[in-house]
Amino acid sequence: FDMPDMTEESFAEHRAAECSSLSVHHNSYLLAAFLLAYRYKKNPVYLEIGRRGLETLMAAYPETELEHSETQEKCRLVFPLAALYDATKDEKHREMLYRVVADLEKVKHPSGGYYEWDTEYRAKYSRVSSTECSLLTENGDPVADLLYSVNWLPIGFAYAYYATGDEWFRQLWKDIVGFC
């Protein structure tokens, strides 16, 4: 979306278009914003955009486009998926949220942080250092990215707790804020 130049016509075009980018990095929080707008304005168009976009990303998950690491993309999905479940209360959306967090938990460090991980090192910036690059050198290195990854988790886990009422998310929130 080119928000500064958004008109009713261009908004309708974007709404009708198929999702052409499977980038969690670039799409997930915009989709969450539509879901929050739906929560407050009750405009079903906002729900449709957020739902369709996140369902498209999750249909490709875990093979979405990666920027820096798998960890980063999973961290960026928690809040949007919690917002989706909060908006719909659909069990399949709840399952999406739990799936991503369960996958993320596989790289949790006892300190409460999350290792950067990139199976097959396929992220866009995994082995490139000409502009910016991942902090990850090798999977298993004791490094957590506080700029691109775990910084998304406090709000994600807090909202997941709000949306689900599950104490597990409250504990995850406590763990990550203790780490940060």
List the predicted regions and their residue ranges.
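Glycan-recognition and catalytic cores of secretory/periplasmic carbohydrate-active enzymes
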Residues: 1-180
